[in-house]
């Protein structure tokens, strides 16, 4: 089998030949990752400055996203009051984002060097994580939207359905469902020599003219279109319900909480869709054989890919601004960390002062020579 699709998204949306200019490729050609894209008119590699810019963006997203998502998971695990059904889903989203952020240094190195230097095992791992993240993120956001729908439109039933234990079970089911794609692409993925360069690719079964487009369309439908449609239906029903009723729960305080959490989930979903729509469309187009025809198009596609990963570091920021409980826990964590540093500095100063005082006292008691 000849490799058709480069597996992770930073590779899926591009294709090129080392010994020619960019062109339209039929789906049965070998597609190479973005760092091997050639200048359409000069047959040269894209500028080093562009590579460095994208790699720098990847590293910034990696560091900021890891700090934010790890803090989100810590807060949910640390505080009992944070273990609500919605926050259990948020934990799952943060976990998926953390895993994919850990792959960005490898992806950045791949782009900068122009080849995959990390071997076959890590190639399979990065491929699997990339696809797991795509499916677990969309499935988790769908579950959060359905959870919000039940809370708003069926408040009595929600008392039995919306529990943290059931949310945990849904999270397990989400990862199991994502394995339907994650495991096969990991098996098909491998580090191969393509045009004298080592590339991390996924081998699509033959006939590739058939399975290539099928693969691309299925990924587009089940990882994006279907979840977004379900989410849209849920929020349409919720908006109609919210407009038709002044009080949802009989309590103004509970009602404010319901609306606040619903707004948070809606914003998280909207940001996700905004960040991932461009790259999803380009993935579908590439799977159908359409390739970028200029260096500018290549640059745009690369930044669209980076935008998808930027989404992974935005969620903790949204929680901090839109959810009072997360904001309070984040503030408590930061204040506690600052207090611990102050205490450590104070203890160190006192220790030094004691040592100096003891040294001075010792020098005073030592008899001077006659």
Swiss-Prot record:
Name of the protein in its database record: Nociceptin receptor
Modified residues (Phosphoserine): 363
GO CC field: cytoplasmic vesicle; neuron projection; plasma membrane; synaptic membrane
Transmembrane portions of the chain: 49-74, 88-109, 125-146, 166-188, 212-236, 265-285, 301-322
Protein's job: G-protein coupled opioid receptor that functions as a receptor for the endogenous neuropeptide nociceptin. Ligand binding causes a conformation change that triggers signaling via guanine nucleotide-binding proteins (G proteins) and modulates the activity of down-stream effectors. Signaling via G proteins mediates inhibition of adenylate cyclase activity and calcium channel activity. Arrestins modulate signaling via G proteins and mediate the activation of alternative signaling pathways that lead to the activation of MAP kinases.
Effect of residue 130 to A: Abolishes G protein-mediated inhibition of adenylate cyclase. Abolishes antagonist-mediated inhibition of G protein-mediated signaling
Presence of keyword Magnesium: no
Glycosylation sites: 21, 28, 39
Maturation and modification: Phosphorylation at Ser-363 requires GRK3.
Cytoplasmic side: 75-87, 147-165, 237-264, 323-370
Provenance organism: Homo sapiens (Human)
Tissue expression profile of the protein: Detected in blood leukocytes.
């Amino acid at each position: 089998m000849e490799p058709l699709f480069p597996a992770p998204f930073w590779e899926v949306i591009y294709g090129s030949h080392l010994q020619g200019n960019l062109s339209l490729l039929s789906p049965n050609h070998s597609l190479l990752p973005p760092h091997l894209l050639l200048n359409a008119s000069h047959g040269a590699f894209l500028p080093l400055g562009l590579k460095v810019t994208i790699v720098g963006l990847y590293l910034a997203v990696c560091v900021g996203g890891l700090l934010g998502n790890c803090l989100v998971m810590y807060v949910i695990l640390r505080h009992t009051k944070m273990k609500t059904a919605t926050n259990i889903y948020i934990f799952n989203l943060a976990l998926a984002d953390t895993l994919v952020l850990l792959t960005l240094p490898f992806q950045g190195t791949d782009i900068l060097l122009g080849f995959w230097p990390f071997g076959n095992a890590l190639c399979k791992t990065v491929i699997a994580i990339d696809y797991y993240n795509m499916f677990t993120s969309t499935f988790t956001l769908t579950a959060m939207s359905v959870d919000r729908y039940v809370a708003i439109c069926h408040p009595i039933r929600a008392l039995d359905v919306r529990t943290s234990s059931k949310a945990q079970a849904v999270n397990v089911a989400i990862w199991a469902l994502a394995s339907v794609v994650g495991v096969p692409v990991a098996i098909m993925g491998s580090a191969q020599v393509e045009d004298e360069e080592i590339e991390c690719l996924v081998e699509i079964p033959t006939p590739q003219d058939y399975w290539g487009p099928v693969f691309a369309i299925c990924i587009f439908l089940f990882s994006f279109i279907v979840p977004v449609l379900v989410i849209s239906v849920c929020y349409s029903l919720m908006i109609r319900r919210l407009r038709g009723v002044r009080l949802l729960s009989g309590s103004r305080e509970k009602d404010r909480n319901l609306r606040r959490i619903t707004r948070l989930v809606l914003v998280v979903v909207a940001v996700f869709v905004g960040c991932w729509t461009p790259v999803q469309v380009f993935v579908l187009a590439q799977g159908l054989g359409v390739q970028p025809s200029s260096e500018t198009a290549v640059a745009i596609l690369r930044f669209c890919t980076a935008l998808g990963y930027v989404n992974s570091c935005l969620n903790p920021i949204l929680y901090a601004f839109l959810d009072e409980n997360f904001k309070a826990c984040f503030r408590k964590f930061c204040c506690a960390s600052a207090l611990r540093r102050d205490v450590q500095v104070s203890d160190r100063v006192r220790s030094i002062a004691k040592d100096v005082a003891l040294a001075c006292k010792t020098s005073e008691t030592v008899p001077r020579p006659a």
